[in-house]
Design a protein with these regions (language model features):
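Flexible "arm" and connector segments at domain edges
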Residues: 2-72, 76-108
Length: 108
């Protein structure tokens, strides 16, 4: 167990935390949904992704943290789906944010 990260400005009690890397989650999504996602195609899948982003926007305007969390998960799952059907490795793609040489990054 480790101490949970800051959430809304406060620390929660010690909770079990499962660590999963981006590739592991992307593989889970691919195993469950890739066949169907490929049949649906990129344009329709992108529309599902946008719908989930809209649901996240609505959730963010509320005080329902559980719903906000659920919608973040949905957005990330659909982002993984899009990455899977366009052959993008999200973990590799996100590595550009791990250094100081990110375009537009200005160290403080």
């Amino acid at each position: 167990m480790r101490e949970a990260d800051h959430v809304r400005g406060h620390r929660s009690a010690l909770v079990p935390v499962s660590v999963m890397d981006i590739n592991a989650f992307q593989r889970i999504i691919a195993q469950k949904y890739k066949r169907t996602d490929l049949q649906r195609g990129v344009p329709a899948t992108f529309m599902w992704f946008i719908e989930e982003v809209g649901e996240l926007a609505t959730a963010l305007a509320s005080d329902d943290h559980a719903n906000i969390e659920e919608e973040f998960a949905d957005v990330f799952a659909w982002l993984c789906t899009l990455a899977n059907i366009t052959d993008v490795d999200l973990e590799r793609a996100c590595q550009k944010y791990t250094g100081n040489d990110v375009k537009g990054f200005k160290p403080k």
